[in-house]
């Protein structure tokens, strides 16, 4: 690209000189021709790029990948802000204006590279004299250029009034604060490298340096915005750098306050680690990678570090270096227990814990509940008796439930009443008033789940180290245990909810009708249905009490002599004296029922 731009520039200049044949007319032609100026601009940018690479080789040598990445990332934003500045100062747009902005962007790039290279000193163990010479020479050159351009902008504003030099003056003033921060950091890193032991107060000085320079940047941007709004227009290109400066200053203030609080808590709340605690665990500080002998602090999460390392760490962030626990929100640490104390405590708890009293299981009829596999719900308490079903018949004998039949007439001689001897299906099952539903259906296990797996036999074959590795003391282990307990609690709640729904449905369906086993059962059911029409789904007319008594006596006579066939004419003749006084509809209804009972008796025989 360099050769192409050079050849294109030479061709444009030669063409202009060929047309004008003199130097001055050639220069005028090149400045007035837009294509020629575009080619010259491209050539100027190429020359600036070559100059930047040359100065980078001189002051930095080989750039690292992180430095190149930061440079490209910041350059895109700087170019965008420069284009926005061109739109704000479009009346002052000229080759000189473009050259000044190009020079400003060029110097900004070297300020960014100097800042990254000085930060690299903290992570590099070996710093050569050539490195110091390059950094000092670069900082001196950049400082002189910044001061010169600030002075030039000031004199231009004093002599010519408000112009585009106002922007350049504030930009170079901001760059002066950047180079001041870089110089102070360089001094602090150099002092730290000269000392044999790590310098504990370096982080404090760096924090207050960033706080001071950040405050100066915020003041400069606020003053620049105020002056630009009053003199020219709203500086849209300064919004992003002003926001970044304010955010950096706010972060520095917050870090200063939180670090002082964390260091105060470390000095007052956190206990010193004892020699036994250091021997019982890995005594290597993960911050400095050196062994801890004395001067170590134990955090609330029971992690131990050097006091000086913690002080430097808390200047940057207020979390545990190992588990990232917020030390400002943690409670007062508790003394860790030795394995012997933990074993004694577990034994005492096991002795003091009373034996749980298991209440007796309710007497449920077989088949009313599906057979639960053993061990499926080991944590459930024993279930109590089921709630009574509203409207379900109890264990009372039928003569109490139907007083009309007993008071209306007395049994005849020779007849044995079977009403009192009849037994309801639910009366023989204490604790549950009705038989199990769905007698013909196979009973499935609840929810279709297989039985729970049996717990492991024991951990006798594992060593202490393996048990500690399985238990875990880090944050992710505790979170995994809590999540497992929450899952178990959720599954138990869901299972209990489904069981309650099952019991509710079971109680709401009511007792099913028992199967017809004998003539007496069928006759009693028909008599009960005729005396209690409210329990039937079909509305029927009410039959008087005397009629019911007659039917009951007739049924008793039928039960006492089963071989003799029962006919409608016999029963009708026995009741012939009473039918004359009843209505024709009731007589017809009774006749049909007796005919139905006769048919049922014949089928059962």
From Swiss-Prot:
InterPro entries: HRD1_E3_ubiq-ligases, Znf_RING, Znf_RING/FYVE/PHD
Assembly: Homodimer.
Organism: Xenopus laevis
Function text: E3 ubiquitin-protein ligase which accepts ubiquitin specifically from endoplasmic reticulum-associated UBC7 E2 ligase and transfers it to substrates, promoting their degradation. Component of the endoplasmic reticulum quality control (ERQC) system also called ER-associated degradation (ERAD) involved in ubiquitin-dependent degradation of misfolded endoplasmic reticulum proteins. Also promotes the degradation of normal but naturally short-lived proteins. Protects cells from ER stress-induced apoptosis.
Residue spans, topological domain Lumenal: 20-35, 114-129, 185-218
Protein family: Belongs to the HRD1 family.
Polar residues biased stretches: 415-424, 546-555
Name this polypeptide is given: E3 ubiquitin-protein ligase synoviolin A
Stretches the record annotates as Disordered: 334-433, 513-605
MF term (GO), any: zinc ion binding
Pfam families: zf-RING_2
Protein's membrane topology: Multi-pass membrane protein
EC code: 2.3.2.27
Compositionally biased residues, Low complexity: 334-355, 403-414, 516-539, 556-579
UniProt free text on domains: The RING-type zinc finger is required for E3 ligase activity.
Cytoplasmic side: 57-92, 151-163, 240-605
């Amino acid at each position: 690209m360099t050769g192409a731009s050079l050849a294109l520039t030479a061709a444009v200049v030669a063409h202009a000189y060929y047309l004008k044949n003199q130097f001055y007319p050639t220069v005028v032609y090149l400045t007035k021709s837009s294509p020629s100026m575009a080619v010259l601009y491209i050539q100027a940018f190429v020359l600036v790029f070559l100059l930047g690479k040359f100065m980078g080789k001189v002051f930095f040598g080989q750039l690292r990948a992180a430095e190149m990445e930061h440079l490209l990332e910041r350059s895109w934003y700087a170019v965008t802000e420069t284009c926005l500045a061109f739109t704000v100062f479009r009346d002052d747009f000229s080759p000189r204006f473009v050259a000044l902005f190009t020079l400003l962007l060029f110097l900004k790039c070297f300020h960014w590279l100097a800042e990254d290279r000085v930060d690299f000193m903290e992570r590099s163990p070996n710093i050569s004299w050539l490195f110091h010479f390059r950094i000092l020479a670069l900082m001196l050159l950049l400082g002189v250029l910044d001061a010169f351009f600030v002075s030039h902008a000031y004199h231009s504003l004093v002599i010519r009034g408000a112009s585009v030099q106002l922007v350049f003056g504030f930009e170079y003033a901001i760059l002066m604060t950047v180079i001041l921060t870089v110089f102070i950091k360089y001094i602090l890193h150099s002092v730290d490298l000269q000392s044999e032991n790590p310098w504990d107060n370096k982080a404090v000085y760096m924090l207050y340096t960033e706080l001071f320079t950040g405050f100066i940047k915020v003041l400069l941007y606020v003053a620049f915005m105020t002056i630009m709004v009053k003199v020219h227009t709203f500086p849209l290109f300064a919004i992003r750098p002003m926001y970044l400066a304010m955010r950096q200053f706010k972060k520095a203030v917050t870090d200063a306050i939180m670090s002082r609080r964390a260091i105060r808590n470390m000095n007052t709340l956190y206990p010193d680690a004892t020699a036994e605690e250091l021997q019982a665990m890995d005594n290597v500080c993960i911050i400095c990678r050196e062994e801890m002998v004395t001067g170590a602090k134990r955090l609330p999460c029971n992690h131990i570090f050097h006091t000086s390392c913690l002080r430097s760490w808390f200047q940057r962030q207020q979390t545990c270096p190992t588990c990232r626990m917020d030390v400002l929100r943690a409670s007062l640490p508790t003394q860790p227990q030795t394995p012997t104390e933990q074993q004694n405590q577990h034994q005492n708890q096991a002795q003091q814990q009373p034996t749980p009293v298991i209440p007796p299981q309710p007497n449920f009829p077989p088949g009313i509940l599906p057979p639960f596999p053993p061990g499926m719900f080991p944590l459930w308490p024993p279930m109590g008796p089921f709630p009574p079903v509203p409207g379900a018949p109890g264990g009372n004998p039928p003569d109490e439930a139907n007083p009309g039949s007993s008071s209306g007439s007395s049994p005849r001689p020779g007849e044995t009443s079977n009403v009192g001897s009849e037994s309801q299906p639910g009366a023989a099952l204490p604790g549950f008033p009705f038989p199990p539903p769905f007698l013909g259906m196979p009973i499935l296990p609840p929810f279709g789940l297989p039985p729970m797996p049996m717990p492991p036999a024991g951990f006798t074959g594992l060593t202490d180290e393996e048990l500690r590795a399985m238990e875990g003391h880090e944050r992710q282990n505790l979170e995994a245990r809590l999540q497992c307990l929450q899952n178990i609690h959720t599954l138990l709640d869901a299972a209990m909810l489904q069981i309650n729904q099952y019991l509710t449905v079971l109680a709401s369906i009511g007792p099913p009708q028992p199967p017809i086993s004998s003539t007496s059962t069928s006759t009693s059911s028909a008599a009960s249905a005729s005396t209690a029409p409210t329990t039937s789904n079909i509305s029927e007319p009410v039959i008087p009490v005397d009629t019911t008594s007659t039917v009951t006596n007739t049924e008793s006579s039928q039960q006492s002599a089963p071989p003799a066939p029962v006919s409608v004419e016999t029963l009708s003749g026995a009741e012939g004296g009473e039918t004359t006084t009843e209505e024709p509809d009731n007589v017809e209804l009774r006749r049909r029922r007796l005919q139905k009972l006769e048919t049922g008796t014949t089928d059962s025989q």
